[in-house]
């Protein structure tokens, strides 16, 4: 597709510099939000949900991905238009974001050139629009140019760009509205949308992936693309969590061990090497105490069952959080970080939700995505403005 965004150009540029519409009135961001319930790091922006159920975002906003009815970049949280309560989750993608309400409805905003907002148009929106024909949903994940959700009945549905089969409907036809992933019509537990691939956990706990497989990111011990789900090698049951990234994927198995596969140029698989792998390899030194693992583009992080965060891979902007800018092929401890309950990985930054429900971020901050009311990158955690 000639007009598709060039990811290498996006990477190079940053490394140099780094249907239905809501009609509720915009709410001002809380001056001093006390607590959050979740946080999601996107490529150049971040969003959270407060304990009041309000959605707020910060960082780059050229396409309206902050959702505040503007295209003004912000280095501190701004309120998403109309979503001031009753939201339980949020997902930040490349240049768009999506939220899930307590009633199971999905709203998306931002870049929409390929229909990734799901409102049956290709019109960008700086405020939330409802996803068309989706029904009730239990989870949503915004990827690069596509989005996926799991319905309350466990069907996996995706929409947006499909040039590499990342929608999983056994075609490469893009869709402005949700389509059902081939064979995943009920019982699915989770979905993770990435750059040009997607992964899900089935009712039986198997990890299945689809889309581009040029670096083995589908994990089926091949490098063959697939327009429909294939089973990840060795992960046929009891998979607890999965995270699809740029060209790599990670998961937590039934023994609470972190496994990763795919592209490994910066050590983002965490196996103390830079060797790509088309099937899962264990993350060096983590053992069986992993609660969740997240990967994005060039680095990955894990949250242990004791609430500690460890990261590995690319670290030029301090995104590993170990108070250095040295890359690491194996996990390093995040510097001076409170006990955490969630970790989320963006392009060149990382964020956590602490046990005290504060949001802290670190890494590249050229667009204000760290949220501390500055554009200064940091190699150790800082509180998001207002916490």
Specify the residue positions occupied by each region the protein language model found:
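Short glycine/serine- and acidic-residue-enriched loop/turn motifs that recur at repeat junctions
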Residues: 58-76, 109-127, 160-177, 210-228, ...
